């Protein structure tokens, strides 16, 4: 049995962070956590690019463009959707999640999702580093691991076909 896993060493990786500006109190903390995690795992500052879009709904379109640029080993989506009194939350959260998932399937680079979907601002802040760790950092580390396992998978030889 052959087992392929991605390492958490990010030296030499180029990463695009795509960040929604809406709910910036939360998303800026996700960005800080993601960038810090990337640096701690070996990514140089010059190999981290940050792209900003208006909100989480718009995030997949920019994420797709960045992922398709072929300049990055990994891209990370960072956003926050906080429930309000209307069904708007479900639409934005659902479509953003579907969009990121579709990009992950279509892309040759690693795609990671650090989009918070929370009932309250307090929950979002907790997940952005106040209490429950930083989900931006977790998404960045997942992107590193995925980028490395994708590299390993690309090296696996094709099976020989019986003639």
From Swiss-Prot:
It catalyses: (2S)-2-hydroxy-3-oxobutyl phosphate + 5-amino-6-(D-ribitylamino)uracil = 6,7-dimethyl-8-(1-D-ribityl)lumazine + phosphate + 2 H2O + H(+). GO terms for cellular component: cytosol; riboflavin synthase complex. GO terms for molecular function: 6,7-dimethyl-8-ribityllumazine synthase activity. SUPFAM superfamilies: Lumazine synthase (SSF52121). 5-amino-6-(D-ribitylamino)uracil binds at residues 22, 56-58, 80-82, 113. Coiled coil: none annotated. Keywords: Riboflavin biosynthesis, Transferase. The keyword Transferase applies. The active site is at 88 (proton donor). Its EC number is 2.5.1.78. (2S)-2-hydroxy-3-oxobutyl phosphate binds at residues 85-86, 127. GO terms for biological process: riboflavin biosynthetic process. Pathway: Cofactor biosynthesis; riboflavin biosynthesis; riboflavin from 2-hydroxy-3-oxobutyl phosphate and 5-amino-6-(D-ribitylamino)uracil: step 1/2. The keyword Cell division does not apply. Catalyzes the formation of 6,7-dimethyl-8-ribityllumazine by condensation of 5-amino-6-(D-ribitylamino)uracil with 3,4-dihydroxy-2-butanone 4-phosphate. This is the penultimate step in the biosynthesis of riboflavin. Belongs to the DMRL synthase family. This is 6,7-dimethyl-8-ribityllumazine synthase. It comes from Anaeromyxobacter sp. (strain Fw109-5).
């Amino acid at each position: 049995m052959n087992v392929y896993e991605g390492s958490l060493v990010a030296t030499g990786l180029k990463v695009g962070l795509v960040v929604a500006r809406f709910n910036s109190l939360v998303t800026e903390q996700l960005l800080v956590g993601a960038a810090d995690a990337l640096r701690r795992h070996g990514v140089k500052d010059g190999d981290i690019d940050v792209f900003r879009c208006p909100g989480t709904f718009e995030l997949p379109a920019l994420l797709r463009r960045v992922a398709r640029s072929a300049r990055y080993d990994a891209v990370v989506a960072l956003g926050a959707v906080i429930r309000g009194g209307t069904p708007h939350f479900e639409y934005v959260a659902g479509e953003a999640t579907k969009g990121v998932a579709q990009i992950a399937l279509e892309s040759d680079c690693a795609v990671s999702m650090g989009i918070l979907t929370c009932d309250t601002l307090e929950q979002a802040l907790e997940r952005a580093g106040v209490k429950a760790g930083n989900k931006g950092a977790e998404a960045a580390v997942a992107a590193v691991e995925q980028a490395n396992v994708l590299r390993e998978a690309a090296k696996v030889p094709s099976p020989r076909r019986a003639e």
